[in-house]
């Protein structure tokens, strides 16, 4: 299975409520993907991501200097207003063993534009090139609401209401996510914890760990 942790508050709700009940074997057998600041969130709950997608505004240099994450594949996105971040992280990126560079403009190898708009949907556009038929992909923190998770930015101490520009970006992200999830050969499933998520693709509401356990086992059985 593939588990993707995004920037919405639902990711933290899931981990706070159910992290201790998730069997270690599940984590060992799952590809864990962190979207930007979700890297810090996962590490807080002693989960090391296998892949990190970031435009570098949700993480700090010291987050990538932790030995535990340095075997991860790091997908770094460059766009018009993060050149200062690129320069700040350059000493770390030069030493990174598994680095993929992406851009919002035309591809110029080895830098690629694989599609997508926000960090969350951009990650899905890349991994969808490698998924298997009926492979389960769970999306946590893909809430698409009016709230931005506290782990989205290092300077956030709590969840914040999205401003108008962020809300617009989230709307585009939701539309792209819906389109990809609905057309993929894999089985994408947005996990809703607490707040209801409105999306034109598969959404599973989790009210307790048994709900998630049954969903996990059902997806595992159907994909085998």
Positions of PLM-derived features:
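Short beta-strand segments
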Residues: 4-6, 36, 77, 102, ...
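Active-site metal-binding loops of divalent metal-dependent hydrolases
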Residues: 7-9, 56, 142
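A structural signal for short, well-ordered beta-strand segments and their strand-loop junctions
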Residues: 101, 136-141, 189-193
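N-terminal glycine-/serine-/threonine-rich phosphate-binding loop
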Residues: 1-40, 44, 50
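Buried, small/hydrophobic-residue-enriched core segments of structured protein domains
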Residues: 87, 98, 129, 139-145, ...
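Glycine-rich phosphate/pyrophosphate-binding loops
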Residues: 48-50, 131-152
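N-terminal donor/sugar-recognition subdomains of glycan-related enzymes
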Residues: 1-21, 148-150, 155-224
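Acidic/Gly/His-enriched mid-domain segments of enzyme catalytic cores or analogous surface patches
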Residues: 30-31, 37-134
